[in-house]
């Protein structure tokens, strides 16, 4: 059984009935329920198609936050070999919210940075729900500097509601760390590819997403603030997040139209959690194609194209 979202209730009800009938048929050794099971399976599939054909921005935000969605470490595990993580910022501590290291992609040495939310209570606490502290962004800068020094392409996976806003993080220079990471991205003379795999929230996301090629999964979101945060500012009422999401243009489709991202990676019907391996493989195909397209571009040109890309964003909106 999947973890169903509120708007998926019609599908949840049908799939619950299917499971009950299958269990009953198995217990009774009966094959007479086959037709009814097939009928319900068709109704369930049709209901899912109907729901996902007309998703609202707020519903997409819920899918982007789905607890079973594939996370950064799953992408790393499936797409890269010989992954060697690096820990710590050499100033204060190691931040588990931000994963970073080196590995091979299709045999090519690359640098990897990504935000990890965790998949259960224990790992979510360990990774601070994907909200990095200053030391996480300083660790990212370490990786970026080494990628530039050794001429390794940089691949980043973005999945965060935003950088950690706690007092301790602010005291250790959260704003400076985010700004430094963003600036370092702009200086790199290597190909940089960024994929928004879930939430891309605020400066915490952009700090590792200033890339030559930026892609989003079909049901991911990317914005300067969460819908709840925007609703709190605009109407002093976070419960109006649905209204905010409808006006913020946070979806992959909106951002592709605005030329903020370079492409959209399709998800299986029902979201990435219903076909993790296929989604991760599709992301791998995009990474491979992007690396091929930038293979013969010199470092200075890559740097200037990246800077120009982000300067153009304001002109296209």
From Swiss-Prot:
Pathway(s) it belongs to: Lipid metabolism; malonyl-CoA biosynthesis; malonyl-CoA from acetyl-CoA: step 1/1
SUPFAM superfamilies referenced in this protein's UniProt entry, alphabetically: ClpP/crotonase
Any one annotated GO CC term: acetyl-CoA carboxylase complex
Reaction(s) catalysed (UniProt annotation): N(6)-carboxybiotinyl-L-lysyl-[protein] + acetyl-CoA = N(6)-biotinyl-L-lysyl-[protein] + malonyl-CoA
Gene3D superfamilies: 2-enoyl-CoA Hydratase, Chain A, domain 1
The keyword Nucleotide-binding belongs to this UniProt entry's keyword annotation: yes
EC number(s) per entry: 2.1.3.15
Pfam families in the record: ACCA
Coiled-coil annotated spans: none
Main location: cytoplasm
Keywords associated with the record: ATP-binding, Cytoplasm, Fatty acid biosynthesis, Fatty acid metabolism, Lipid biosynthesis, Lipid metabolism, Nucleotide-binding, Transferase
Disulfide topology: none
CoA carboxyltransferase C-terminal domain span: 40-293
Gene Ontology process terms (BP): fatty acid biosynthetic process; malonyl-CoA biosynthetic process
PROSITE patterns the record matches: COA_CT_CTER
Family, per entry: Belongs to the AccA family.
HAMAP family named in the record: AcetylCoA_CT_alpha
Free-text function comment from the UniProt entry: Component of the acetyl coenzyme A carboxylase (ACC) complex. First, biotin carboxylase catalyzes the carboxylation of biotin on its carrier protein (BCCP) and then the CO(2) group is transferred by the carboxyltransferase to acetyl-CoA to form malonyl-CoA.
Subunit details: Acetyl-CoA carboxylase is a heterohexamer composed of biotin carboxyl carrier protein (AccB), biotin carboxylase (AccC) and two subunits each of ACCase subunit alpha (AccA) and ACCase subunit beta (AccD).
Protein name from the UniProt record: Acetyl-coenzyme A carboxylase carboxyl transferase subunit alpha
The species this protein was found in: Brucella abortus (strain S19)
This protein's encoding gene: accA
């Amino acid at each position: 059984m999947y973890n169903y979202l509120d708007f998926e209730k019609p599908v949840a009800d049908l799939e619950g009935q299917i499971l009950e009938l299958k269990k009953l048929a198995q217990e009774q050794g009966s094959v007479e329920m086959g037709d009814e099971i097939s009928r319900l399976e068709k109704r369930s599939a049709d209901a899912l198609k109907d729901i996902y054909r007309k998703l609202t921005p707020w519903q997409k935000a819920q899918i982007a936050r789905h607890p079973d969605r594939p996370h950064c470490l799953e992408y790393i595990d499936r797409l890269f070999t010989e992954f060697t993580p690096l820990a710590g910022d050499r100033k204060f501590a190691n931040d588990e919210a931000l994963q970073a290291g080196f590995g091979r992609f299709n045999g090519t040495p690359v640098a990897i940075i990504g935000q990890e939310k965790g998949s259960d209570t224990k790992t979510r606490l360990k990774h601070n729900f994907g909200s990095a502290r200053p030391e996480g962004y300083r660790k990212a800068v370490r990786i970026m500097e080494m990628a530039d020094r050794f001429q390794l392409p940089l691949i980043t996976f973005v999945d965060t509601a935003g950088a950690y806003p706690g007092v301790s993080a602010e005291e250790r220079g959260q704003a400076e760390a985010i700004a430094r990471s963003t600036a370092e991205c702009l200086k790199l003379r290597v190909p940089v590819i960024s994929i928004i795999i879930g939430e891309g929230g605020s400066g915490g996301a952009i700090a590792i997403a200033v890339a030559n090629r930026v892609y989003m999964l079909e049901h991911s979101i990317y914005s300067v603030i969460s819908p709840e945060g925007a609703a709190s500012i605009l109407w002093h009422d976070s419960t109006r997040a649905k209204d905010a999401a409808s006006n913020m243009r946070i979806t992959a489709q909106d951002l592709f139209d605005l030329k903020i991202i370079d492409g959209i990676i399709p998800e299986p019907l029902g979201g990435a959690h219903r076909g993790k391996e296929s989604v991760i493989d599709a992301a791998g195909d995009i990474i491979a194609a992007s690396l091929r397209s930038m293979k013969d571009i010199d470092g200075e040109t890559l740097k200037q194209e990246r800077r120009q890309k982000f300067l153009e964003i304001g002109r296209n909106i």
